[in-house]
């Protein structure tokens, strides 16, 4: 695969959160605010890049019988590094993400990319795939986090100081009073419903594009649509 195809598949065509539905547990549980979504998304992106690189370097040299176990250990090392870094530099965000940060180790997205793609590709392609898949997952988290924060708290980016530092306290937008927000949007059931609506909208857009492309192909071939 060329670089453009890898990027397109990771971010759009095979978006891990909105198309493959991988990593639903953190996607639904942590995306209550833009800050939480951005923090976990960046952490997952970093783990994907590092674990894919390690899998590409070690995979061809590992016996098939122990490959999965070694990949889990490599992923655990990457997650531990990210978690300790976040605990040192962003303690507020680290506390807000809680158990879901170390649970990146069990995220099926990370292990699936290491086993099914990175271990069979060059290090450069593996790193690019990790970046593309991580970016796709980050965008899915941000989209859901923005909708949930807006509907549930009436704000956007209200807690970005957890990630960017005290200088950004109050840097978000409070669009309407928090008391007027929808409580269900802050909870996991609301996240599940909103994700379903986002998936339905995405499917409708893709279906419309297929119909338009199909009609264009028929017209180009000289066949009247509907004949």
Describe the function of each predicted region.
Residues 1-8, 162, 166-171, 206-227:
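Intrinsically disordered, low-complexity non-transmembrane regions of multi-pass membrane transporters
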Residues 24-28, 44-45, 49, 76-83, ...:
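Hydrophobic core segments of alpha-helical transmembrane domains in multi-pass membrane transport
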Residues 34-50, 70, 94-105:
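Structural signature of hydrophobic alpha-helical transmembrane segments
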Residues 51-64, 111-121:
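C-terminal ends of transmembrane helices
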Residues 62-75, 96-102, 126-129, 215-216:
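Cytoplasmic-side transmembrane-helix entry/capping segments in multi-pass membrane proteins
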Residues 81-97:
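Transmembrane alpha-helix boundary signature
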Residues 130-155:
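Hydrophobic alpha-helical membrane-insertion segments
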Residues 157-186:
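Short, membrane-exposed interhelical loops at transmembrane-helix boundaries
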